[in-house]
Curated annotation (Swiss-Prot):
NCBIfam families: PRK11594.1. It comes from the Bacteria. It is found in: Cell membrane. It is a multi-pass membrane protein. This is Protein AaeX. Belongs to the AaeX family. Pfam families: DUF1656.
Length: 67
């Protein structure tokens, strides 16, 4: 359980995990933009799978911070 309450915006209720997902997505975009120029994707076998795993790891780290 998260310590944050459900947030209501314009009558729509959002669980706390929604904002954790958005935060991890923003960090993923930043990390992705930093990794592309380094050429690390030349060594990655499946870029879409790598991106998915990277996002899942970032989401896990963010969600552990807020619990």
């Amino acid at each position: 359980m998260s310590l944050f309450p459900v947030i209501v915006i314009f009558g729509l209720s959002f669980p706390p995990i929604f904002f954790e997902l958005l935060l991890s997505l923003a960090i993923f975009w930043l990390v992705h933009r930093l990794l592309v120029p380094t050429g690390i994707y030349d060594f990655v076998w499946h870029p879409a799978l790598f991106n998915t795993a990277l996002y899942c790891c970032l989401f896990y780290l963010i969600s552990r911070l807020f619990v």
